[in-house]
Amino acid sequence: MSYLRGMEVRAKKSLGQHFLTDQDIARRIVDALQGSPVLEVGPGMGVLTQYLIPRLADGASSGGSTDALRSEAGSASPDSSLRSAPPTCSASGPLPLTSRGWLRSGLARPASTARQLKAIEIDKESVAYLKKHFPELGDGLIEGDFLKMDLRGLFPGQFSIIGNFPYNISSQIFFKIIDNRDLVPEVVCMIQKEVAERIAEKPGPKTYGILSVFLQAWYNIEYLFTVGSGAFNPPPKVQSAVIRLTRNSRTELGCDEKLFKAVVKTAFGQRRKTLRNSLKPLLQKAGRLSEPGRVHSRSAAAECGLSSAAAPANPIPEGPVFDLRPERLSVEDFIDLTLRLTP
C-alpha cells in the first residue's frame, strides 16, 4: 500500500487501486463525457468527481443529455466510430477541487448533485474521504460493489457511466454494462491499454476477441488517448487508455442471444482452429452432432441455447465461413453464423 501525496486514502492492491493524479488527464476524461445524469464507478479520491460536480450541480451538462445520445444512436450505424488513438498524454495539473481547492480556485461551491451525479465506491476509506471533501455528493455517494448493484432505479431514465475501472475487473464491468445496455447509452472509462485496444479492434488481428464482439454488437467504440504509468500513484506496470462507448442503433441481434454468446465464446475458446472444428464441441454438447458412446441431454442443450430434439443429429452446415478462424468474423458474421446454427 502507498499513500497518495500523504493524503488519507491508501492504494490497496487487493482492489486494484492506482489513483490518477494527473489533473489534465482527469479533465480530458470528464470533457469526453457527453450525457447526463452520470454514474461514476470507483471515484477513489475524487479526481474525476471534482470536475463532474460543477458540471452537474445545476442539472446542466456541457455535453448532451442521454435523450440526445439516444437520438444520435438511432442514426449511427452499429459498427461505426472505431478510431485510432491520439498521442500519449502526461502532465501535472492544478490543485484538485477538494475543500481547500474550491477556496483557492475562487469558484463558488456548488449545491447538491445527488439528482444528476451518483458515485459508487467499494472502499470504505475512499468513501470516508469523499464524504469529507465532497459533501455535495450527499445521498448520491453509494458504498457498495458495482458488480452486485441493481442499476435500475438509480435515475428516472437512462444515464452515462464514467470511471477509472480497476484492471482486474474491467471485463466484468463491461459485461454488466452490456446486460444493462438499454439504461446506459454512453460510457467513458480508463482501462488497461491492451484491453482498450482489444475492445476497439476491427476483425482480422489476433487482438480481436470475445469482448470486441460483445461490446461492438451494442456500442460504437472510440479509442480516445493513451495514458502513461507516471500519471498514477502508485504507478501501474502497464499503460492505460481512455475509451468512449456510445450506444449504436441496434435494438436486437436478430438471433437467439444466448446461442450467439455461446457461439462467440466457443469459437474464441479455440481461436487457432477453424470454426468447423472449434464449434464441434458446442454442437456435440447440445446433441446436434453425434458422438459415439455419449448420450446428450436436454439440459446440456439448454445450457448452450440449442434444442436437443429427438431428430437425427445434423452436421455443421457447409460454407466457406466454417473454414475461417473467429478473428476474421464481424459482429454481423457471428449473427449470421448463429442463425445458420439455430435448429
Predicted segments with their positions:
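Active-site-proximal or metal-binding-adjacent scaffold patches in catalytic folds
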Residues: 281
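Catalytic cores of RNA-modifying enzymes
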Residues: 1-78, 98-266, 288, 293, ...
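Catalytic core of IPPT-family isopentenyl/dimethylallyl transferases
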Residues: 320-333, 337
